Amino acid sequence: IVGGSEATSGQFPYQXSFQD
């Protein structure tokens, strides 16, 4: 799992707009 600056509503912070 790579750490991004955008925390999502999913499980992990991704390097993009990942809405789970």
From Swiss-Prot:
Top-level class of the enzyme under EC nomenclature: hydrolase
Keyword Hydrolase set for record: yes
Domain Peptidase S1: 1-20
Enzyme Commission no: 3.4.21.32
UniProt keyword annotations, A-Z: Collagen degradation, Hydrolase, Protease, Serine protease
GO biological process: collagen catabolic process; proteolysis
Disordered: annotated span: 1-20
Domain of life of the native organism: Eukaryota
Record field: catalytic activity: Hydrolysis of proteins, with broad specificity for peptide bonds. Native collagen is cleaved about 75% of the length of the molecule from the N-terminus. Low activity on small molecule substrates of both trypsin and chymotrypsin
GO molecular function terms attached to this record: serine-type peptidase activity
Record function comment: This enzyme is a serine protease capable of degrading the native triple helix of collagen.
Family stated for the protein in its record: Belongs to the peptidase S1 family.
Name under which the protein is recorded: Collagenolytic protease 36 kDa C
Organism annotation: Paralithodes camtschaticus
